From Swiss-Prot:
It is found in: Endoplasmic reticulum membrane; Cytoplasm; Nucleus; Cytoplasm, Cytoskeleton, Microtubule organizing center, Centrosome. Transmembrane segments: none annotated. Keywords: Cytoplasm, Cytoskeleton, Endoplasmic reticulum, Isopeptide bond, Membrane, Nucleus, Phosphoprotein, Ubl conjugation, Ubl conjugation pathway. Coiled coil: none annotated. Residues 268-503 are annotated as: Required for interaction with UFL1 and mediates interaction with CHEK1. The lineage of its organism: Eukaryota, Metazoa, Chordata, Craniata, Vertebrata. Substrate adapter component of the UFM1 ribosome E3 ligase (UREL) complex, composed of UFL1, DDRGK1 and CDK5RAP3. Interaction with UFL1 anchors CDK5RAP3 in the cytoplasm, preventing its translocation to the nucleus which allows expression of the CCND1 cyclin and progression of cells through the G1/S transition. Interacts with ATG8 family proteins MAP1LC3A, MAP1LC3B, GABARAP, GABARAPL1 and GABARAPL2. Interacts with CDK5R1; competes with CDK5RAP1 and CDK5RAP2. Interacts with RELA. Interacts with CHEK1; may negatively regulate CHEK1 and thereby stimulate entry into mitosis. It comes from the Eukaryota. InterPro entries: CDK5RAP3 (IPR008491). Disruption phenotype: Prenatal lethality, probably caused by severe liver hypoplasia. 16.5 dpc mutant embryos also show defects in definitive erythropoiesis. Conditional knockout mice lacking Cdk5rap3 in hepatocytes causes lethality after weaning -specific Cdk5rap3 display liver hypoplasia and die after weaning. It comes from Mus musculus (Mouse). A motif (Shuffled ATG8-binding motif 3) lies at residues 306-309. May be phosphorylated by CDK5. Ubiquitinated. Probably triggers proteasomal degradation and is negatively regulated by UFL1. GO terms for biological process: apoptotic nuclear changes; cell population proliferation; definitive erythrocyte differentiation; endoplasmic reticulum unfolded protein response; liver development; mitotic G2 DNA damage checkpoint signaling; mitotic G2/M transition checkpoint; negative regulation of MAP kinase activity. This is CDK5 regulatory subunit-associated protein 3.
């Protein structure tokens, strides 16, 4: 018998209410009686004496049977003057709370209510709070990751912007104006290139002599455009065409298209609808399209190139429309007023002749190398002195000079300047291309700031939920101890264990 009293009673918490009903500790209609008790409690708490402990019991917690017992004990002190010779109280306050205690004890209603509270806390309230806290922590990690992505993406796009600006030779402070300013400086740059052609006289004569020697008969002069620029410099098309210098040059006016939206006025649009989670956290809607793929930007080797739809060679095929009517004699107007290196047709001829001369000199350097066969050397024994008096080093030096001139004329920066010169509205396309990178950088920076704010909101929400969870766990543990102690009394002090609470 003594061993039987020490055998613990293990009760699964989820089956606790059924266990009480099956063992007739309470009846099936306990819920209706609990509703009546709750109504009486709500009425009784409207008239309570001034007491700090009573106020603490009534604030922010569910009032159950053991709270009522404590309130009755406190009222015995405050309502002592209303006690008669028979030990009863005439105070309505005391009568109300004594009635509530009596109703609780009827059919052990207090016990089943406590068990109901315990089951609800263990099965619903505590898991719900834990889920909300876990959601806050998940959001913080997600926002932290997006913050890092936004920061890295903003830096990458900004670097691409300045790298592209460097290719164009501008600072990027005002892309449009700087590009137009470069076009205004283009004539002086082309004049320098034309002046650089003056050092090619020896190479041109060498090529002319070789052609005459190989053909074994007098021929017309080779490289006419290159010869002309070498002697006259970068003159006007009119002078090249007519052979006389114009008395008046009416250059086409560079049309400046109207200013577009200010560069610092960026329309961020709408960040989309935000969804509110169960915990009150405002989470970013998954459907938001930021229009930016960080992975593709990092892998795209041609990110700094503009796709203009046609072949890149089309840049050199743009023709400038002639303005006005036929010009009188001595007046250079329209395309005639442009310089040879500004006008696409003559510029292309100049570049072609530079490349032709470069190929010739490169081939002569190869023929003069040590690996050259004896036959090619013997062929030039009867050549003019200008051909025989050359060295490989001299050929390579001339080739280097030609390559520098070709490189300056065909560089990506120069191609874009020629396109701007031919079509000023091309400036807007380049400006939009460059500004798009800067706008994307600023958008990613703003997104990063937004992620920081959302991360802070999630952290604050977690900080507000954790004390609630701690308080609920404490109250639930108290309920568990009270229930285990009450059931233990009904079974001669046998230990009672409520299983599955995981507190």
């Amino acid at each position: 018998m003594q061993d039987h009293q020490h055998v613990p009673i293990d009760i699964q918490t989820s089956k606790l209410l059924d266990w009480l009903v099956d063992r007739r500790h309470c009846n099936l209609k306990w819920q209706s009686l609990v509703l009546t008790i709750r109504e009486k409690i709500n009425t009784a708490i409207q008239d309570m004496p001034e007491s700090q402990e009573i106020a603490q019991l009534l604030s922010g917690s569910y009032i159950h049977y053991f709270h009522c017992l404590r309130i009755v004990d406190l009222l015995k002190g405050t309502e002592a003057s209303t006690k008669n010779i028979f030990g009863r109280y005439s105070s309505q306050r005391m009568k109300d709370w004594q009635e509530i205690v009596s109703l609780y004890e009827k059919d052990n209603t207090y016990l089943v209510e406590l068990c109901s509270l315990l089951v609800r806390n263990v099965s619903y309230e505590i898991p719900s709070l834990k889920k909300q806290i876990a959601k806050c922590q998940q959001l913080q990690q997600e926002y932290s990751r997006k913050e890092e992505e936004g920061q890295a993406g903003a830096a990458e796009m900004r670097e691409q912007f300045y790298h592209s600006c460097k290719q164009y030779g501008i600072t990027g402070d005002n892309v449009r104006r700087e590009l137009l300013a470069l076009v205004k400086d283009l004539p002086s740059q082309l004049a320098e290139i034309g002046a650089g052609a003056q050092s090619l006289g020896e190479a041109i004569d060498l090529y002319q002599a070789c052609v005459e020697f190989v053909c074994d008969s007098p021929t017309e002069q080779v490289l006419p455009m290159l010869r002309y620029v070498q002697k006259k410099g970068n003159s006007t098309v009119y002078e090249w065409r007519t052979g006389t210098e114009p008395s008046v040059v009416e250059r086409p006016q560079l049309e400046e298209p109207p200013e577009q939206v200010q560069e610092d006025e960026i329309d961020w649009g709408d960040f989309g609808v935000e969804a509110v989670s169960d915990s009150g956290i405002v989470a970013e809607t998954p459907g938001i399209d930021w229009g930016i793929s960080l992975e593709s930007e990092a892998k795209d080797a041609g990110a700094d190139k503009i796709d203009w739809g046609d072949d890149a060679a089309a840049a050199s095929e743009i023709t400038v429309l002639e303005t006005g009517t036929e010009a009188p004699e001595g007046v250079a107007r329209g395309s005639d007023a442009l310089t040879l290196l500004e006008y696409p047709e003559t510029r292309n001829q100049f570049i072609d002749e530079l490349m032709e001369l470069e190929i010739f000199l490169s081939q002569r350097a190869v023929e003069m190398s040590e690996e050259a066969d004896i036959l090619s050397v013997s062929q030039f024994q009867l050549a003019p002195a200008i051909l025989q008096g050359q060295t490989k080093e001299k050929m390579l030096s001339l080739v280097s000079t030609l390559q520098q001139l070709i490189g300056r004329l065909t560089s990506l920066r120069m191609q874009h300047l020629f396109m701007i010169l031919a079509s000023p509205r091309y400036v807007d396309r380049v400006t939009e291309f460059l500004q798009q990178k800067l706008k994307q950088s600023q958008l990613l920076a703003l997104k990063k700031e937004l992620m920081v704010e959302k991360q802070q909101e999630a952290l604050q929400e977690q900080a507000a939920l954790e004390p609630k969870l701690d308080l609920l766990l404490e109250k639930t543990r108290e309920l568990q101890k009270l229930i285990e102690a009450d059931i233990s009394k009904r079974y001669s002090g046998r230990p009672v264990n409520l299983m599955g609470t995981s507190l």
